[in-house]
Amino acid sequence: MADSVQAGRMRESKPGEGPVALSHPTFMQRNGRARQVRSLLTGLLGLLATLASAQSQGLRFVDVTPASGLEGFDGLQGSVSKQHIIEVMGGGVAFLDFDADGRLDILLVRGSTIEQFERGGDLMCALYRGDGSGSFEDVTLRAGLTARGWGQGVAVGDFDSDGRLDFFLTGYGSNALYRNLGQGRFEEVGRLAGIARSHWSLGASFADFDRDGDLDLYVSNYLAYPLDRLPQRDANCNYRGFDVFCGPRGLPGLRDSLYLNDGAGKFTDVAAERSIDDDRLYGLGVLVADYNNDSWPDIFVANDLTANLFYQNNGDGRFEELAVLTGTAFSQDGVEEGSMGVDAADIDRDGWLDLYYTNSSYESNSMLVNNGDGSFTNLTYASGHGESTHLFVGWGVAFGDLDNDSREDLFVVNGHLYPEADRFEMGLRYEQRWLVFMNHGDRQFLERGEEFGLSERYKSRGLALGDYDSDGDLDVVVNNLDGPPTLLRNDGGNRGAWLLVDTRTESGSPAVGARVLATSGGSTQLREVRSSASYLSANDLRQHFGFGPDARAEQVSVRWPSGRTSTLSDVELNQVITVEEPDGE
């Protein structure tokens, strides 16, 4: 039985039970600062290693895939030799509780091959029902998930407000919208809803952009890429002296889509009339969050080899594109990057969401700190992410408190685009290891992945976090290219106290867009409920907090998408709680 919190009353559950004008530094100034901090980086990292939190000592990530039941999923996308760009984009993954039994399930998005796609494609996803102990059963066909094509990404949310969790799949050729019928069954309603477009979509995110009480949808679209006119390898498509597949540069991009929900199951694309993505950039990861604390959901789009997009929601139906003005469009040197995955968190607990996105090799991933005045400062090198990510091609990324010490850490998965990378010099590899950045406070991170048992190399794409075994720490699932996924159990991450907060709207739906604050020891942590994040993926919708040695949270508050608020005081830790939105009367 789920915990319930309403109007300040709470029933507790025990561990293991179910869930009850912007002023910012110029590019030259930021680059100068980066050069200064690089000279101090070696000494700083040594100091951080010495001061590494005792909370994370003994933390290990254990690969439990062979015993999980997930090994039957094949992440093959196209040919092994990767002749075309569509064959390397990979797929997303989601932790979700589709049957509301309190145990996390896993959804993996599947691609196809060009030959198979011409015959109708493969099943776009596979759904695995979890038993709470680490075993997952393939229920794809039983659940009615029969749409075929070339799957790419996933976003989760209750678009029809019936209290059951639905999901949206992006893909090449067509997208799919699955409505949850209950009793473990789904129906595909994309065409009926008006969102089964025939082109190449990658990222997606549900959010109530107009705050009318139902979930709208943003979709990032990539390339116009007809299979009967695929660009072939030639001398014009060259990377470090090797002929490689062509794209995306030189190929026509597609406008992103902004679908507004009419509340009756129909969506209308208003992107053109709202001047969304007029330049038709190469859209990949999408992250919806309230970056300026005005209670309206804003949009960040990580674009491939073109400027990123940052849409501020003005609350009147208009979105203002401010990427250049906010400092989120380019690298700290003013250069376009190959940006892919994205996440946001309040890394310094100042009440403002900071931004992180992954990039291609020789670019380093980007850590942008929110100044609270409508601008961001690039602290990639100053925070410990520059040198550590320089030779990696980053994809999935997720913030989370991996050791329950009350600071949000960061997990990044990698893998090069080109099989030819193994022939490059300068340390590049096709398969690459994963990175774990532990947050040591003062905006400082230390990469410790190998120390935590992550030395294997993969061609990884999608990444999601969630506590699948209900032991109070965050576990990891990764969708790999050309192979089975990886399920990592977090061992030792639950030494500190924890809390999982499940937020539910009046209709019983997961409260996508809700903001959750938890205060203990005079410090406040911030989380937001998001339908998607990372690279084409979705984390558990329940919000996880770590509290270190604390015994209770002084206060837990929720700001609902409707604008209402709920506040709980003196909350016992090491449990799952459900907070229900108060009625509107």
Tell where the protein language model's regions lie, with residue ranges.
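Hydrophobic beta-strand segments that make up the repeating blades of beta-propeller
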Residues: 103-110, 162-171, 217-221, 298-303, ...
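Bacterial N-terminal signal peptides
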Residues: 39-52
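Blade-edge beta-strand/turn elements of extracellular beta-propeller
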Residues: 61-64, 135-144, 185-195, 265-277, ...
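Asp-box/WD-like beta-propeller blade repeats and closely related beta-sheet repeat scaffolds
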Residues: 139-156, 169-209, 219-249, 253-255, ...
